[in-house]
Structure formats: C-alpha cells, structure tokens
Amino acid sequence: MTSLTSHASHWAKQLGLGVAFYRLYHQPRQFVQRWRRVGLSHLADLAHDQRQMERAAAALPPLAPRSGPPLEVYYLSGRKFWYQTVFCFYSLALQTDLNVQLVVVDDGTLSHRYQNLIRQVCPTVRFVLATEIETRLNAVLPWERYPTLRSRREAYPNLRKLTDIHAGTTGWKLVLDSDMLFFRPPTALLDWLKNPQTPCHMVDVETSYGYSPALMERLAGVPIPEQINVGITGLQSDALDWDELEHWCRTQIEQAGSHYYQEQGLIAMLMARHDCCVMPPEDYIVMPGPAEVISPQAQLHHYVAESKPGYFRHGWKHIVNGYSDPT
C-alpha cells in the first residue's frame, strides 16, 4: 500500500495534479482514519459540535480597541478554520491587557463572508488576502526559481505558514495554530512577543517531522532538536533563506516523498541553527486528555489528534462561559 501510494503521489506530481490528488486521495483517507478512530456515529456528533462552535464564534461580543504598541499575532485561516482562529485569538486577548492585534493570512478560501464574521468579533483585524499574497510570491518566489515551494504550497496548505506569511516581508512574526485555546496568561509567550530576539516554539508530545533525522541533519548541517511543535512559531521573516528552503523541500520529496509533517520538519531544521526560546512545557498541554479538557489546569491547550473531539465538545465552551482559574 505504501509503495502504491508513493507511486501515485509521484505521478500526480509529475502531471501537475497535486491539489486534485490531495482531494481525491488524502482527504478521503483522512475521513476513513477518523472514522476508524471514533466511529461513524461519533463523527456525526463531532460535526454537530463543530457547527455549534462555529455559531458561537459568530456570537462572541466584539473585542474593545486597546491602547499601547500593537503586537501582531498571525494565523493562516479561511473557510474551514475561521471560527477556530477567532476562538484562539479571543481567548488570548482575554488573558492580557496588551494591545494584541489579529492578522489573518488568507489560505485561499477567506471570502468576504468569513472576513466579515471575523471582523465583527475582532474589529481591528488585518487581513492579508490571496491576491496580495500571489503578487508578492510571484515577485520574491517566482515559479521558475522556486518550483518545489510553489507547487508544494498548492498541494500542501500547511507550507503556506512559511511561504505566504514570511516570503517578501520583514521583521519577527508570531504564528499560532488556530486549534488552541488560552485559559491563563501565557507569560513566556507574551514576553517573547514584546521583545523577540530568537526564534520560539513549543514542545510536542513526540517528534513528528515526517523525515529521518539523518536526512534532516545532512540538509541542515546540524543536529535537529526533537519534539518541536509549530503550534507556536516565532521566526524572523527576512532571515529565511528561500534558496535553501527550496533545496530542502525538493530533496526531501525526491528522496523520501511528501509528508503531512513536512512543514513542521522544515521549521525544526530552521530552529536547529538557533538558541531558541522554548515555551516552558509546564505551561501548556499538547493533546490534553479528557479530564484536562473538561477542567483546564494549563495556560494553554493545543488540541491535536485524539483531543479534537474534546475541543469541539468542551474546549471552546470554557471561553464562552468565562472560564475562571480554579486556583
């Protein structure tokens, strides 16, 4: 099966069918995997919980304008994730008096409808739309020079958290995954946001890079730290070497095929060359268990894998109900 999949991926890539292959193969496969994990009836419950969360996001009271230096927080988002983005940023804003500002980078599906839904809750939001992104990428990452990065971002939207947010821009940027919620002030994260000096990241429950340490270390030229999670990622945009990233991305695919965790692996390779600011693992929980989901003790939850049902069933409701610190 693995061999068949890799051959199919190869020919889809050669024929320029990256997006179509992703939709026709990977998305149905993801559905089957989820069905096997939680059962078909529970998938229906999950879909109901997601719709309930989406309606709740649209009904959140608007965030009031704040004073002080603006501190931008970036998300890649669109039609499928806008409400998760709103809840994540909203929960962060509730935990600080700093002038945090939402920046939503269009994943290609951020129509006027979803822009308006986000803006009614986060009135000061700034959108970076697909037309602007495409123009910028054509200027700084032209297809003829960066064919792998450009084609890969079409088939693999996660890569846009690198290309679309950072290419052709300057300065430090904090990028958060949308499937996270804050329950207490994230002191270390806010300290970094106020004065970024080195890249930052959070710690995963396991190492998930998609490629062998040997290949990654050979490409990066340094040992690769384990368990980097890109739910929290702070990078300096103008410090990224896009020729190098093109080489890394192309070589990984040529030698080991494409992988869902490639973006996390590439960022881990970038982080490996720096003395990074690692968010303290005791402050947050990646993939919280049922008890923690129902009664949060950590500052932050990152709801990956098996914790998704709890996120949609319980997590966001803590924000709506005005979660209070049990301590």
Predicted segments — roles?
Residues 1-61:
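Membrane-proximal basic amphipathic "stem/tether" segments
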Residues 70-75, 92, 101-104:
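Hydrophobic targeting segments
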Residues 79-96:
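Histidine-anchored nucleotide/phosphate-binding helix
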Residues 101-108, 202-203:
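Short internal beta-strands
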Residues 115, 119-168:
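Active-site-proximal specificity loops/subdomain of glycosyltransferases
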Residues 157, 161-207:
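GT-A fold catalytic core of metal-dependent nucleotide-sugar glycosyltransferases
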Residues 205-207, 223-306:
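Catalytic core and acceptor-binding pocket of nucleotide-sugar-dependent glycosyltransferases
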Residues 295-327:
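Long, low-complexity C-terminal extensions of enzymes
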